[in-house]
Amino acid sequence: MYKPYENPHATFWNGVRNYAFLMWALTVREIRAASGGAALGLLKGIGMALAFCLVFYFIMTFAGLTGLAVRGDLMIFIIIGIGFFFAAKMTMMAALSAMTGSWDMASHPHLSPVLFVYSKSIAVFYNYFIAIVILYLGNGMINGSYELQSPIMFFPLFTLSWLCGMGAGMFLGFMMFYFSWAQLFKRVFMRVLFITSGKFTNANVIPNDALPFFTWNPMFHLIDQMRGAAFINYTPHNTNLVYPIIVTFLLLVSGHILHDYMLRHRNVMT
């Protein structure tokens, strides 16, 4: 049976330092390996987010759907929705791939699947955080105004959406490790997340009968709350921050518990 390597002479701070170094090394490796280099990975994230923003900007403009947005910069409205959703989705997929595909590498001393979850997730955070900031600054240069009422709220809300995606990915990774039907569930779940995230919808204008279809999704709350922080003329009425915080906490705790169970179960089998 495989047992993790233990150094009897190691101290707590040595362990923290070694863990941080491993995290940094794996994160750099993920950033470079994703698209052949750190710069290419960043450009890929910017390009994908920009493409979606432009497509839906023209759709909403030419289809006369701008009234569904808030009073303010339509592109900022779309950038917030696209950026937050894709950051959470790509983090979820990264954590999922780490939970299901890193067990061979995790058999080496000091490594574990959760370390790969962290490194892959941090790589996604790095790419999409910078991508959103660049898109925002580029839009401000074109329009001549940088509309963001409470910029201090951007980082905590973006981090919360990132953590939510990581916890959901760990939970899905456990399901796909043990259940054959989890692959189909993941596909359906991703489609439902795409529809109910509210990235192109003003949450305040959704009819009450349709609200339950959206409010279960923590990303719906986070995107709407960020728009409330961004636009001076918009106040969220149908969303809050308590729900996504609770869901994110439960997903992260359950994800780490299930990871520990998977690790122990695999060690017993091997």
What are these regions (language model features)?
Residues 1-270:
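Hydrophobic transmembrane alpha-helices and immediately adjacent juxtamembrane helices
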